[in-house]
Amino acid sequence: MRIEEGLKLGFKDVLIRPKRSTLKSRSEVELERQFTFKHSGWNWSGVPIIAANMDTVGTFRMAEVLASFDVLTAVHKHYTVEQWGEFVKRVPESVLRHVMVSTGTSSADFDKMKQILALSPALKFICIDVANGYSEHFVSFLQKAREACPDKVICAGNVVTGEMVEELILSGADIVKVGIGPGSVCTTRVKTGVGYPQLSAVIECADAAHGLGGQIVSDGGCSVPGDVAKAFGGGADFVMLGGMLAGHDECEGRVVEENGEKFMLFYGMSSESAMKRHVGGVAEYRAAEGKTVKLPLRGSVDNTVRDIMGGLRSACTYVGASHLKELTKRTTFIRVAEQENRVFGSN
């Protein structure tokens, strides 16, 4: 046993210090980024925000809408190959280029992933997703996927430390997914005592990834657009959002009615709700590590995406970054004891 004494920070522990700027308007800020990925060599340009691969968020409908904003969607792994086939036939390649095919790490998952990718060459992204990216089995699966799919962009995770980011990149990942426990409906930190404050994880993992020519995605911990800006400011190349995109028309959560008001259920993918839906219940050897919440229906996701992107542009103008890529170079974090004036409630 040992204790690391250094302070680790989450998004709520800091604010971004404003700086002199030559920008006259938020409209001058360019959010699109261009990447050439380490292993696949593929060039991609777009707004580096990703809808999370949760079965109530990473849906086909979400992918269609977000593609119109040049935003990615990690489509959840529970659609059948037949459902994927119908989707591929229905949408243009411009949508498919903004889609990640999510997979688990079993042999059946691998076979299913290959069948889905064979449906269209426009499907370029793979998201290999497990709660604990530190297992040898996960690394072996990543190596197997890289060997089978040399031209695909592989996003793999989740981890929170630099040495594991390096191992995953050297094993074939183009992008490493960073975050253990920060999600809005994740209870891993409560159930296990394991985790890492998200901003510090992003800063440390970005440094490790960029040293090897890889990228990271900050997964979890964002509850407002300012948190998204902080993630990019901390060095994240992509930011993945679940709760901020939940409860919209494009989601597939079950709708319930209470006292005449309708709500949509949103739950973590290790919650009892998720395990009942997909594997028949919680296995007797494990505990659920997610919760279920009821969200008021929020309408179309369009307005939420515009709000997030507007907040990002504004953050860039406050520090003089004309392009999103410049935000991390222009960011100085200050530690704070409060985030906002709550006299009329939280914004």
UniProtKB/Swiss-Prot annotation:
What is the top EC class of this enzyme, as a single word? oxidoreductase
Name any Gene Ontology BP term: purine nucleotide metabolic process
* Signal peptide annotation: none
GO molecular function terms listed in the Swiss-Prot or TrEMBL record: GMP reductase activity; metal ion binding
| Binding positions for K(+) per the UniProt entry | G181, G183
Which Enzyme Commission numbers does its entry carry? 1.7.1.7
Q: What are the entry keywords?
A: Metal-binding, NADP, Oxidoreductase, Potassium
Q: Which reaction does it catalyse?
A: IMP + NH4(+) + NADP(+) = GMP + NADPH + 2 H(+)
Alphabetized InterPro entries for the sequence: Aldolase_TIM, GMP_reductase, GMPR, IMP_DH/GMP_Rdtase_CS, IMP_DH_GMPRt
Q: Which GO terms describe its cellular component?
A: cytosol; GMP reductase complex
Q: Which Pfam families match?
A: IMPDH (PF00478)
- Write down the SMART domains for this protein, in alphabetical order: IMPDH
| Subunit and partners | Homotetramer.
Provide the family line.
Belongs to the IMPDH/GMPR family. GuaC type 1 subfamily.
NCBIfam families per the UniProt record, alphabetical? GMP_reduct_1, PRK05096.1
Q: What function does this protein fulfil?
A: Catalyzes the irreversible NADPH-dependent deamination of GMP to IMP. It functions in the conversion of nucleobase, nucleoside and nucleotide derivatives of G to A nucleotides, and in maintaining the intracellular balance of A and G nucleotides.
Family matches, as HAMAP family: GMP_reduct_type1 (MF_00596)
Protein name listed in UniProt: GMP reductase
Species name? Yersinia enterocolitica serotype O:8 / biotype 1B (strain NCTC 13174 / 8081)
Its gene?
guaC
